[in-house]
Amino acid sequence: MKKFLVLVIGVLMSVIAFAHAPLISVDDNGDGTVYIEGGFSNGTSGEGVEIIIVKDKAYNGPEETFKGKEIIYKGKLDAKGSITMPKPATEKYEVYFNAGEGHVTSKKGPALTAAEKANWDKATASFDVGEWKELMLEK
């Protein structure tokens, strides 16, 4: 009986541990912007969760880093758990959904193409990237 009870408790604990795994989607809108949506596997919204975009290569310089990579943008998801924003100018980047220790996941983002450049210029002019402008636009 004791072994059975320990087994049941173990199974329940593992189900609880995986009940709210973080999820992220990074979709290419084809117009120089990306749609980022985050949430949890139990259906909870990612509203207010921090989004971090990093260059997809190791970095050991003076700029702020996350997981050993240079941060080029930090922001938060809106009330719908999403954000539509211009693609970073860097060729390779990764988007992190950072809901705290043990609740971090990431996905590589689509690169900006030459065909999207005109639309991207408009998107970057209207989207407020705040203090991250130089890093996002590589200026």
Residue ranges and their predicted role:
Residues 50-74:
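Short amphipathic beta-strand segments in non-cytosolic proteins
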Residues 89-103:
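Short, aromatic- and glycine-rich surface loops/edge beta-strands on solvent-exposed regions
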Residues 2-10:
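Sec-dependent signal peptide recognition
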Residues 42-47:
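A short beta-turn/strand-edge loop motif at beta-sheet boundaries
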Residues 18-39, 117-139:
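Beta-strand-rich domain onsets/edges
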Residues 67-87, 91:
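Glycine-centered loop-to-beta-strand initiation motif
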Residues 14-16:
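N-terminal signal peptide c-region/cleavage motif recognized by signal peptidases
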